């Protein structure tokens, strides 16, 4: 009897490492050429921060190859159901009573944050738990937990929560009627997301460089243009580290007096992500980074293509990372790293095999690489 030979990585996943390797070389070259950031600690820490997410994703795929992922998924999903029920109960109470679980008032209602320091952390936690339940969904009662999750997300009144809820219904329809999710569907979703948050986008953009977020987007393009084609280098722009080790860039482009971008208060420097990419690594680095992200999309599609529930959960997490990246440095923070690990490990069976023969371990969720590569 021929047994399975577990294969750790697809060729597309190996390409992720190559894209990011070249990306890091670009960062090193621009750092050496322009010598903008004088603090070596900032350079080393920034390099580590940006390489974390592909390293954790690839390592999680490899190291979890021998785990029983179905059992792991069920275990995590059972706990998630309990947490969602508790959080939902308090979300309803928070509507009618002041119980110290809100951060501010939006649309005339309290913005729910539960026990988190900010509602954005509640949003990311709910997204992860909701996706785990979607992947594990085997009872009609699970629909209740999904609905509760959606209500909780809406009650945070965060724009990214609204767009994620839209993504859930949009991608669910795509899988139902088209049987698959393509990259172009994600772009269509992005257009809908822009329409939903258009008023907020216009409001923020109207401030120009006198407000932190639009200033980062605008100056990021100027930085990429002036340091073509490789950008300004590690530790120079649009990251918490560039504030902690205050980068000369903010003085060079006259935004060092903008609230949230000053030497004494630089909390808003990580309120975006993409200016960090094209500002520090230039247009070449931006293309390489996008190529790595597209490769992760293909990786997810190939690993979960046999199971719609798992695929939906994985693509929702992928979509959330893209949504959140417009307003936070999710690719470099703990939340983003954890989401990549969840996609690789906690959404059920996604291992790949090079043989399909009589073996008792084979089931309908095992991926036959001959059918998709």
Q: Across the structure, where does each feature detected by a protein language model lie?
A:
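Membrane-interface helix-loop-helix junctions at transmembrane boundaries of multi-pass membrane enzymes
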Residues: 3-17, 135-144, 179-182, 297-315
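Long extracytoplasmic/lumenal interhelical loops at the membrane interface
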Residues: 204-211, 215-218, 233-281
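Transmembrane signal-anchor hairpin modules in multi-pass inner-membrane enzymes, especially those
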Residues: 1-29, 350-373
